[in-house]
Amino acid sequence: MATKLTERQQEILDLIRQTVARTGFPPTRAEIAQALGFRSPNAAEDHLKALARKGAIELTAGASRGIRLKVPDNAAPSAQLTHPLLAQLVLPLVGRVAAGSPILASEHVEREVGVDPGLFTQTPDYLLKVRGMSMRDAGILEGDLLAVKRAAEARNGQIVVARLGDEVTVKRLQRQNGRIELLPENPDFSPIVVANTDDFALEGIAVGLIRTQPLH
């Protein structure tokens, strides 16, 4: 990052890093505004655009959590997967998972990739390549690698990898009044209501995200 940040911009960048470290995902504009005492999310948006111009982050238009911390300027977009100084943890990359309409997941490991363990809130067990845009507003986009920790249980509101029969999907878990729903983060998609008769299981929880392609 070649351009020096203002004190306020550094505060926002630190907040983004802390939120990603704690939750695995960046904060929303409203969360930034609340944490730093801005009057509205628009003030946070102005600072985020300045950070993007200075090369500290990348922004995804239309996504409430569409904030990406950038790798060093001299690194290629995929460097966080292959750079020898960062590749300290080797994870299997499992077949593509639909983050739109659920599709049959590939069970074989496509390859193994080395990643920086500091990218994640917990140590993941594998990476899943996302296809589709149903989790767009959580900042999870087509082609992203979702870091997943195997888990049979999850807290309400966590982003999970869930299996319905032989199909796998990435959604936000919601339990309410004894009912389980898998919620998208895109108004173009409908929630999935899990019936008592469905063959349902949690495959894991999301603990981080890696982008392998630059934002446009």
Curated annotation (Swiss-Prot):
One Pfam family name is Peptidase_S24
Q: Does the keyword Membrane apply?
A: no
Give the GO terms filed under biological process for this record.
Answer: DNA repair; DNA replication; negative regulation of DNA-templated transcription; proteolysis; SOS response
Top enzyme class: hydrolase
Task: Give the reactions, separated by semicolons, that this protein catalyses.
Answer: Hydrolysis of Ala-|-Gly bond in repressor LexA
Q: Does the keyword Endoplasmic reticulum apply?
A: no
Source domain of life is Bacteria
The Enzyme Commission number assigned here is 3.4.21.88
InterPro entries membership = LexA, LexA-like, LexA/Signal_pep-like_sf, LexA_DNA-bd_dom, LexA_repressor, Peptidase_S24_LexA, Peptidase_S24_S26A/B/C, WH-like_DNA-bd_sf
> What are the UniProt keywords, alphabetically?
Autocatalytic cleavage, DNA damage, DNA repair, DNA replication, DNA-binding, Hydrolase, Repressor, SOS response, Transcription, Transcription regulation
Give start-end ranges for the coiled-coil region(s).
none
Name the active site residues.
Answer: 134 (for autocatalytic cleavage activity), 171 (for autocatalytic cleavage activity)
Output the Gene Ontology terms for molecular function: DNA binding; serine-type endopeptidase activity
Site, Cleavage: residue positions: 99-100
Residues annotated as DNA-binding are 29-49
PANTHER family given in the database record: LEXA REPRESSOR (PTHR33516), LEXA REPRESSOR-RELATED (PTHR33516:SF2)
HAMAP family per record:
LexA
The similarity annotation says:
Belongs to the peptidase S24 family.
What does the annotation say about its assembly with partners?
Homodimer.
Quote the function comment for this protein.
Answer: Represses a number of genes involved in the response to DNA damage (SOS response), including recA and lexA. In the presence of single-stranded DNA, RecA interacts with LexA causing an autocatalytic cleavage which disrupts the DNA-binding part of LexA, leading to derepression of the SOS regulon and eventually DNA repair.
Q: What is this protein called?
A: LexA repressor
Q: Which organism is it from?
A: Bordetella parapertussis (strain 12822 / ATCC BAA-587 / NCTC 13253)
Gene that encodes it? lexA
